[in-house]
C-alpha cells in the first residue's frame, strides 16, 4: 500500500516556515531524519498522543517520547495534558508549534546570514599569505612572522582571495529569502 503524502500546513505565516526547513530543523535536533520526519508527519496530521504516533509509525514508544521531548525543549512542539477520569492517568496530546518553529528558523537564518556577511567583510578588508602546506595568515600576522610560516618554516606567498569573496557573495545571495 502506498504511503499518503502529508501536507505541511502552518497556522502561522512566516517566510521561514516550509516543509524543508522544518524537517532540516528536526534533523538538527535528532540527527535522525527518517524517524523525525515520521513523527513530524503525525504532528501535522492532528493533535496526537505519543502512543498514537508510536502505533502509526512503528517506532518504539520511548523513542517517540525522546524525540517529542527534544522538539518540546526548543519549543517546536507543545502538548496538552488530560486526565482520564477512569484510570486517573494523564494522556499527553502533542501538536506542532508553528510560531515557535518560525522564530527558531528566523534566528538560525539571521545567525548564518550574519556569519556570511562578516566573512565577506573580513576577506575584503584583508590580504592573505599562504605557505605551500596551506596555512593562511592575514597580512598583519604574516608580517609578524616575517613572511615565514610558524608551523612549517616555509615562505608565505600572497594569495588572491577574490574567488573566495565571489563564492561568499554567491552564497549570500543564494541564502537570501524572497520577501
Curated annotation (Swiss-Prot):
Report the superkingdom from the record.
Answer: Archaea
A family per Pfam = TFIIE_alpha
A molecular function annotated in GO for this UniProt entry is:
DNA binding
User: Which keywords, in A-to-Z order, does the entry hold?
Assistant: DNA-binding, Transcription, Transcription regulation
Listed InterPro entries: TF_E_archaea, TFE, TFIIE/TFIIEa_HTH, TFIIE_asu, TFIIEa/SarR/Rpc3_HTH_dom, WH-like_DNA-bd_sf, WH_DNA-bd_sf
Q: Which GO terms describe its biological process?
A: regulation of DNA-templated transcription; transcription initiation at RNA polymerase II promoter
Domain HTH TFE/IIEalpha-type, by residue range, is 1-102
Q: PROSITE patterns, per this entry?
A: HTH_TFE_IIE
Briefly, what is this protein's role?
Transcription factor that plays a role in the activation of archaeal genes transcribed by RNA polymerase. Facilitates transcription initiation by enhancing TATA-box recognition by TATA-box-binding protein (Tbp), and transcription factor B (Tfb) and RNA polymerase recruitment. Not absolutely required for transcription in vitro, but particularly important in cases where Tbp or Tfb function is not optimal. It dynamically alters the nucleic acid-binding properties of RNA polymerases by stabilizing the initiation complex and destabilizing elongation complexes.
What family, per the record?
Answer: Belongs to the TFE family.
Q: What's in the domain note?
A: The winged helix domain is involved in binding to DNA in the preinitiation complex.
Q: How does it assemble?
A: Monomer. Interaction with RNA polymerase subunits RpoF and RpoE is necessary for Tfe stimulatory transcription activity. Able to interact with Tbp and RNA polymerase in the absence of DNA promoter. Interacts both with the preinitiation and elongation complexes.
Which protein, by its recorded name, is this?
A: Transcription factor E
Recorded source organism is Methanosphaera stadtmanae (strain ATCC 43021 / DSM 3091 / JCM 11832 / MCB-3)
Taxonomic lineage: Archaea, Methanobacteriati, Methanobacteriota, Methanomada group, Methanobacteria
Amino acid at each position: 500500500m502506498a504511503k499518503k503524502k502529508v501536507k505541511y500546513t502552518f497556522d502561522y505565516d512566516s517566510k521561514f516556515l516550509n516543509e524543508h526547513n522544518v524537517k532540516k530543523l528536526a534533523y538538527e535536533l535528532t540527527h535522525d531524519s527518517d524517524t523525525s520526519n515520521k513523527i513530524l508527519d503525525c504532528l501535522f496530521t492532528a493533535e496526537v498522543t505519543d502512543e498514537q504516533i508510536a502505533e502509526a509509525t512503528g517506532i518504539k514508544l520511548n523513542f517517540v517520547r525522546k524525540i517529542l521531548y527534544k522538539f518540546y525543549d526548543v519549543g517546536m512542539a507543545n502538548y496538552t495534558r488530560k486526565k482520564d477520569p477512569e484510570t486517573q492517568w494523564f494522556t499527553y496530546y502533542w501538536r506542532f508549534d508553528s510560531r515557535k518553529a518560525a522564530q527558531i528558523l528566523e534566528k538560525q537564518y539571521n545567525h548564518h546570514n550574519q556569519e556570511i556577511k562578516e566573512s565577506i567583510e573580513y576577506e575584503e578588508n584583508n590580504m592573505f599569505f599562504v605557505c605551500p602546506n596551506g596555512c593562511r595568515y592575514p597580512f598583519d600576522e604574516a608580517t609578524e612572522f616575517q613572511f615565514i610560516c610558524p608551523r612549517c618554516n616555509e615562505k608565505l606567498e600572497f594569495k588572491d582571495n577574490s574567488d573566495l569573496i565571489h563564492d561568499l557573495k554567491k552564497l549570500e545571495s543564494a541564502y537570501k529569502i524572497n520577501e
